[in-house]
């Protein structure tokens, strides 16, 4: 599928088509597929307990969450990313179809409009709050940071995971209609950046390093003490960084209130889930918490990418 090919020939008239067909004729659109293993996969059912990474465990209770079981956990994770949502959906649909009778679908989310930059060539996108998101995210070209914060290395107790990463997902609902009624100055103080420019409130341009010691004309912190960028910064968290690759989402309209349902489908990769836990705990006092709420959560161990002749699970099951 990542090469734009059919799963199999669609020629037998008296059998279901091997490929569902909706992406026939579509370009590959930079399709990538990532596989992850959840903590529960390593329980007594499959004899994999001895191969469970020590760092892989269900996330502990964290601030500002009320998790819905319908969007939480899972034994396996499939993430398909593409410039064409149809191509991504085709990949997930056909992989799920192959697992019919063996796996049970737990939850699925369709994201749109990435919410962070991952390469230096990308312009910073905006989230549903209207702010630029991911300005200080790790970039793929920063190999030292990728090795230091994203890729699992020799520190793991499981050789099959070396070169892979841990994936954390959080479905974060945003109360967009309440946010839209807030004053611009309040919005900027909550985030810690200018809404249009993306520059930190301490001054400069979007990519100016925030000065968390700067004061405004009244002698108050230019970036408020509870601003999102302050509490989430690596300076505030002992140097902790993660690679964010999230998307916006919408679930339509709340049938009970008539309000818009949408928010951030947070996705991040890291060397150890403890990195995310530290950052999320630091956000307990985030001023943004008035407008967002975590309703889904999962963590997975993702093995490294495949080379020719390799297959998913090869390192884990052999």
Regions found by a protein language model. Give the residues of each.
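Long, histidine/aromatic-enriched segments associated with O2/redox biology
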Residues: 1-318
């Amino acid at each position: 599928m990542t090469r734009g090919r059919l799963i199999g020939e669609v020629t037998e008239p008296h059998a279901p088509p091997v490929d569902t067909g909706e992406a026939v004729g579509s370009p590959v659109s930079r399709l990538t597929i990532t596989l992850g293993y959840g903590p529960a996969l390593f329980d007594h059912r499959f004899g994999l307990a001895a191969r469970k990474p020590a760092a892989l465990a269900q996330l502990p209770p964290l601030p500002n969450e009320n998790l819905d079981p319908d969007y939480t956990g899972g034994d396996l994770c499939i993430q398909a990313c593409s410039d064409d949502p149809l191509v991504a959906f085709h990949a997930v649909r056909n992989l799920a179809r192959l697992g019919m009778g063996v796996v049970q679908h737990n939850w699925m989310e369709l994201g749109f409009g990435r919410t962070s930059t991952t390469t230096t060539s990308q312009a910073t996108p905006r989230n549903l709050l209207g702010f630029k998101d991911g300005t200080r995210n790790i970039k793929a070209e920063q190999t030292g940071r990728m090795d230091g914060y994203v890729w699992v290395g020799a520190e793991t107790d499981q050789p099959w995971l070396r070169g892979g990463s841990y994936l954390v997902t959080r479905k974060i609902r945003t109360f967009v209609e309440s946010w839209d009624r807030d004053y611009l100055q309040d919005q900027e103080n909550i985030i810690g950046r200018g809404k249009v420019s993306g520059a930190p409130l301490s001054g400069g341009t979007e990519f100016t390093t925030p000065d968390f010691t700067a004061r405004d004309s009244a002698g108050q912190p230019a970036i408020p003490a509870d601003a999102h960028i302050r509490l989430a910064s690596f300076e505030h968290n002992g140097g902790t960084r993660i690679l964010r690759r999230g998307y916006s989402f919408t679930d339509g309209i709340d049938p009970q209130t008539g309000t818009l349902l949408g928010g951030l489908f947070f996705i991040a990769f890291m060397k150890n889930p403890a990195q995310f836990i530290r950052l999320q705990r630091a956000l307990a006092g985030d001023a943004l918490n008035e407008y967002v709420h975590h309703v889904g959560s999962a963590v997975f161990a993702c093995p490294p990418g495949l080379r020719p002749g390799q297959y998913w699970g090869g390192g884990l099951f052999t």
